Amino acid sequence: MKGLTRLLNSLSRHTASVTCSPSSSSLLISRRSLFISAATHFPVNFSESITTNASRNCSRSSSFPFNWIEQRRTMFIQTQSTPNPSSLMFSPGKPVMEIGSADFPNSRSAMSSPLAKAIFAIDGVVRVFYGSDFVTVTKSDDVTWDILKPDIFAVVMDFYSSGQPLFLDSQATAAKDTAIHEDDSETVAMIKELLETRIRPSVQDDGGDIEYCGFDTETGIVKLRMQGACSGCPSSSVTLKSGIENMLMHYVSEVKGVEQEFDGEEEGTSSGPME
């Protein structure tokens, strides 16, 4: 896990680390053809299905006498594994989120984004996450990536070729959870600054993100929600304890621990006031 490893290396006194060797595969998708890198192996019907879909959307002029001259649109899509085997990062080679990130834990939450909505329409997709230059897709356990990848590649390619906005409401999703307010205590401000500048970039390297949910002033517990590939990841508890918790406790003496919030968990269940 390269993000967590980088986070742990910044604390020389802590030796716990989690490693993951991400592997990537590259696809060069054209409106007329699909080129797959030699390092990636897919079933024979993989290229056929994407080529057919790409060719169907190809804009051609039947009146032009030479059918070998036509407009082509090419996109280079790269995939990268994450610490969560059920999540995969798709990098379209261009910015996705200009500011912040966006998490879609279900299809209902994706109604405001045409791309996320289209990805959720693929059978087997259970979560979508937007990062700065990648889209993380999480699948259910009963489907394989060999089946899902062709459809996801086609959806991403069609979206960026269409020119549609990422969000229908045209409002950028900024990282508001770590925005420092005037009424924030010095402790909360320090926690937010560390999350935004030191921890969040490392977590995003692994295809996920974190959301600040509050700080319990009585117990010293920081509440965080894991997003994207980090949500449901087998290594998420290690990320919290060995990486995030150690760093927050090292720089902010008031922090005594970190606990994870889960989707759908009721607010206000903590024993003390949350800031």
From Swiss-Prot:
<dbReference type="GO" id="GO:0005198">
    <property type="term" value="F:structural molecule activity"/>
</dbReference>
<dbReference type="GO" id="GO:0005506">
    <property type="term" value="F:iron ion binding"/>
</dbReference>
<dbReference type="InterPro" id="IPR034904">
    <property type="entry name" value="FSCA_dom_sf"/>
</dbReference>
<dbReference type="InterPro" id="IPR001075">
    <property type="entry name" value="NIF_FeS_clus_asmbl_NifU_C"/>
</dbReference>
<dbReference type="GO" id="GO:0016226">
    <property type="term" value="P:iron-sulfur cluster assembly"/>
</dbReference>
<dbReference type="Pfam" id="PF01106">
    <property type="entry name" value="NifU"/>
</dbReference>
<comment type="function">
    <text>Molecular scaffold for [Fe-S] cluster assembly of mitochondrial iron-sulfur proteins.</text>
</comment>
<dbReference type="GO" id="GO:0051536">
    <property type="term" value="F:iron-sulfur cluster binding"/>
</dbReference>
<dbReference type="GO" id="GO:0005739">
    <property type="term" value="C:mitochondrion"/>
</dbReference>
<dbReference type="InterPro" id="IPR035433">
    <property type="entry name" value="NFU1-like"/>
</dbReference>
<protein>
    <recommendedName>
        <fullName>NifU-like protein 5, mitochondrial</fullName>
    </recommendedName>
</protein>
<keyword id="KW-0496">Mitochondrion</keyword>
<dbReference type="InterPro" id="IPR014824">
    <property type="entry name" value="Nfu/NifU_N"/>
</dbReference>
<keyword id="KW-0809">Transit peptide</keyword>
<feature type="transit peptide" description="Mitochondrion">
    <location>
        <begin position="1"/>
        <end position="61"/>
    </location>
</feature>
<dbReference type="InterPro" id="IPR036498">
    <property type="entry name" value="Nfu/NifU_N_sf"/>
</dbReference>
<comment type="similarity">
    <text>Belongs to the NifU family.</text>
</comment>
<dbReference type="GO" id="GO:0005524">
    <property type="term" value="F:ATP binding"/>
</dbReference>
<dbReference type="GO" id="GO:0005507">
    <property type="term" value="F:copper ion binding"/>
</dbReference>
<dbReference type="Pfam" id="PF08712">
    <property type="entry name" value="Nfu_N"/>
</dbReference>
<dbReference type="GO" id="GO:0005634">
    <property type="term" value="C:nucleus"/>
</dbReference>
